[in-house]
């Protein structure tokens, strides 16, 4: 620590030699007005390599016009001071020499010594002051005070160099190192792997890899827990839906069972009704009814084709025609006598005297005498009594006609027994 304090004292003397307002070398140069820029303040916990410090002060003292090639590092945005990206390691592997486009530059002009310095400089990346010693080396001083870290303010080269002046050793030990805070999961995993990490930064590459590995495991564990939680919620939802569907299915099964029971009862009632109908019906009556229906149907079918007793059929076809022929008939004596009286009106009185008379004979005689009188009149000379006397013949024809042949036969009963036969009796 004494070595650092000695180097700090020599640096102050050098700055007083350069920038003292009374007798300094650069007292006539207004550096603040020439390059009055806003210097953004970032994380002060950064360190510059000794090679970079040496190049800067060699250019400042030796008056060289070369630009320092030492890069300026930016701190990691991680909470532990290291990057979580496995492809970036700003502490151990410096970035390329390309300077950012908005990076401020400091130009130092020296009239007497012709010293012009134009180099990239990032004040926010300076963690400690860099002061040259007598042997030409550089060393690290204290951290920049937090009171000077504002968002933007104009600075001169002297202010920049004075801001890096060393502080006491107690402040260096308190401010230059950030405490490493580990969670319970990280501590448990480190203990499980048998690894220990220091309580303060900076960490070595191996320790950083171990810490990244532990934190990656914790992230994977958390993501796995979240996925398991979502899966569990999804499965719970499916189970609830399945329970609801099962309850609905049981309800439907119960309704189906009730409908089946109702159907069975209805079928049983139908069987009973059929049995009652079959037992109450008379089978012979049913058979007789069927026979009558069959006979009626046959009769209705065959009756229009038969018609054996109708006169229209005989008259239409002309197969038979009625003929009046003399058939065998029995004539009584009185009828023969009437016919003879018509032929011989004068012989009727003689025959009447001979034959005994009955009451019927008197009637017949009266009829015969009446017919004879009519025949003797001149207007009835052409009158044929036989052709007009059709009372007996028509009566006999209507009642004694042959229905098959159509012949008409006249039958006359003899009123007297033992009388003699008529002349036409031999026609039989």
From Swiss-Prot:
Residues 304-428 are lumenal. Residues 93-103 have a biased composition (Pro residues). Residues 1-286 are cytoplasmic. Controlled by regulated intramembrane proteolysis (RIP). A fragment containing the cytoplasmic transcription factor domain is released by proteolysis. The cleavage seems to be performed sequentially by site-1 and site-2 proteases. Residues 210-273 form the bZIP domain. Glycans are attached at residue 389. Residues 385-402 have a biased composition (Basic and acidic residues). It is a single-pass type II membrane protein. One of its GO terms (biological process) is regulation of transcription by RNA polymerase II. The record marks 330-331 as: Cleavage. Belongs to the bZIP family. ATF subfamily. This is Cyclic AMP-responsive element-binding protein 3-like protein 3-B.
